[in-house]
Amino acid sequence: MARIAGVDLPRNKRVVVALTYIYGIGEPTAKKICKDAGISEDIRTNDLTPEDQEKLRSEVDKYRVEGDLRREVSLNIKRLVEIGSYRGIRHRRGLPVRGQNTKNNARTRKGSKRK
């Protein structure tokens, strides 16, 4: 089992799909990583050689993923709340941040309706 960026990649999946298990890497980024590392997208994770795994690790290290990315996102939200911007206020109140209507919808964000 390949371990990259602190994440155990699933064994029997294609490398492109397995890389998407890492927070911050989607399918387009995974394809770019495979291309830059010179690894076929169709190869399975359990068929990777140790050299291939090392190539993938070095390519993934060029991106901000997992803990660093989570920390950056949370700090960005914290900054918005501290400066009192509209988006920060919406985060603080637990309401939708990106302009969605809240008259009837947004139950996931607002919580259950009290009777």
Curated annotation (Swiss-Prot):
Q: Identify the Gene3D superfamilies for this entry.
A: 1.10.8.50, 30s ribosomal protein s13, domain 2
What family does this belong to? Belongs to the universal ribosomal protein uS13 family.
| Xref: InterPro entries | Rbsml_uS13_C, Ribosomal_uS13, Ribosomal_uS13-like_H2TH, Ribosomal_uS13_bac-type, Ribosomal_uS13_CS
Q: Which GO terms describe its molecular function?
A: rRNA binding; structural constituent of ribosome; tRNA binding
- What's its job? Located at the top of the head of the 30S subunit, it contacts several helices of the 16S rRNA. In the 70S ribosome it contacts the 23S rRNA (bridge B1a) and protein L5 of the 50S subunit (bridge B1b), connecting the 2 subunits; these bridges are implicated in subunit movement. Contacts the tRNAs in the A and P-sites.
Q: What is this protein called?
A: Small ribosomal subunit protein uS13
Keyword Iron belongs to the record:
no
Which terms in the GO cellular component ontology are assigned? cytosol; small ribosomal subunit
